Amino acid sequence: MSTGLLAKKVGMTQIFTPEGDCVPVTVLEAGPCTVVRRKTAEKDGYDAVVIGFGVVDEKHAHRLSKPEVGVFKKAGTPIFRHVKEIRVKDAKLLGDLKAGDVLTVDKVFKANQRIDVAGVTKGRGFTGVMKRWNMKGAARDSSTAHEHHRHVGAIGQRKTPGKVWKGKHLPGHYGVDNITIQNLTVVGIEPEQNVLLVSGAVPGHADGLLFVNTAAKGQPRIKQKQEVRERAKPKV
């Protein structure tokens, strides 16, 4: 079985646990995704599965090249807007998946499972150092210049080094970065609507594309009852 799905961000809300705690969650429309291609180590050099999400209308299919359309025709699937390849180290994780199989949210994920969500952050345009790099800024009464207290300040010496070092935090474009939020928890699943409820926030705006995958850093351990060991009785 595949370890992840492509999803669309719907928005945020909150739910209440049986204990009465309020938990902020993000609603994701995860899948259904169709297997477009299955790759094997014998033929392709590694094990992977290619999934598609979001069917493309026929009037927009002409935007694809002939080789791209040929991939979908060979698999016998509709043309998808988004395609993602998921590599695995062990072919057993993919089971007997083949082209044309449909993956739903309840087949891939389960409640209380830890996941990683990857997406593109919101674009905020050209911003200053206080918003982009969380700089403190100058004192409000240290200068009479307009908005000088929001400036970057000193960025180097005159003669030594005589330049601005690469990587110096300066104003510039902020956002539109590929990031991954790790170890989020699946709070709930609604298979009828392909909805996945995830604790916390995920990157991107509403209707943004996301890739939801099994957490790379392990799953929560199930607490088991410790065995009570009897001490050996001393010999008399």
Curated annotation (Swiss-Prot):
The keyword Ribonucleoprotein applies. InterPro entries: Ribosomal_uL3, Ribosomal_uL3_bac/org-type, Ribosomal_uL3_CS, Transl_B-barrel_sf. It comes from the Bacteria. Keywords: Ribonucleoprotein, Ribosomal protein, RNA-binding, rRNA-binding. The keyword Ribosomal protein applies. GO terms for molecular function: rRNA binding; structural constituent of ribosome. One of its GO terms (biological process) is translation. GO terms for cellular component: cytosolic large ribosomal subunit. Belongs to the universal ribosomal protein uL3 family. Part of the 50S ribosomal subunit. Forms a cluster with proteins L14 and L19. HAMAP family: Ribosomal_uL3_B (MF_01325_B). One of the primary rRNA binding proteins, it binds directly near the 3'-end of the 23S rRNA, where it nucleates assembly of the 50S subunit. This is Large ribosomal subunit protein uL3. It comes from Anaeromyxobacter dehalogenans (strain 2CP-C). The gene is rplC.
